[in-house]
Amino acid sequence: MKISILTLFPEMFSIFNHSIIGRAQENKIIELEVLNIRDNTLDKHKKVDDYPYGGGAGMVMAPQPIVDTIRKAKENNKGKVVFLGPRGKTFNQKMAMDLSKEENLIFLCGHYEGIDQRVYKHIDMEVSLGDFILTGGEMAAIPVIDSILRLIPGVLGKEESFMDESFSEDLLEYPQYTRPYEFEGECVPEILLSGHHENIRKWRRLQSLNLTENRRPDLYKNVILTKEDKKLLGRKNK
């Protein structure tokens, strides 16, 4: 997969040069391209924003630099243009999985008070992280892109690594433990030391179900309980 990122602050995406995503780039599993919107402005002072028509606080990103940067990206990337903005659908794991199946993607990061409305006809999809305000689209783009890239086969080293993680099936992940066995008076659950893989699997499943029901009832209501789940929870099969 190739991802092109259109931004006013390219240096913010240097985080992808490290750790798992950095290794995936080195191994040619994925390709990231960062384009500076400011490089494509026709303004001699490299200005990319202006005052809003009709008045109001703040500045609005002008259409010309953005649209020309989109066109520049599309010379080598025919993927969907995804804009990080408050009008979009709330991003979730299912959306990450769907987007990970795309061959290429282009991410547009807004800034200031937003983008000129005339840019929207060049956008295929708008996503939001939630009902809160960030200082720029870059802050939202980083977790969205990371959640997509880690689903690409080979990025995590083994494809099954993400299958048991939180949200993969609307369940929070079970508790994890490592050495030492005892820490500040709290010990690792004995079942995890038993070596009985089937019992461990059932214990982990029960922990995930209980955690999700208690912490994220909004997710739990979407969970379809199996007969085994109901038995683990001590509920009657219905």
From Swiss-Prot:
InterPro entries: Alpha/beta_knot_MTases, tRNA_m1G_MeTrfase_C_sf, tRNA_m1G_MeTrfase_TrmD, tRNA_m1G_MTases_N, tRNA_MeTrfase_TRMD/TRM10
The keyword Cytoplasm is annotated on this UniProt entry: yes
Species name: Clostridium botulinum (strain Alaska E43 / Type E3)
Residues the record lists as binding S-adenosyl-L-methionine: G110, L129, G130, D131, F132, I133, L134
Keyword terms of this UniProt record: Cytoplasm, Methyltransferase, S-adenosyl-L-methionine, Transferase, tRNA processing
Matching Gene3D superfamilies: 3.40.1280.10, tRNA(m1g37)methyltransferase, domain 2 (1.10.1270.20)
Function: Specifically methylates guanosine-37 in various tRNAs.
Cited CDD domains: TrmD-like
Record keyword Magnesium present: no
Source taxon at top rank: Bacteria
Family classification: Belongs to the RNA methyltransferase TrmD family.
Top-rank EC class of the record's enzyme: transferase
Subunit structure: Homodimer.
Entry protein name: tRNA (guanine-N(1)-)-methyltransferase
Enzyme Commission code: 2.1.1.228
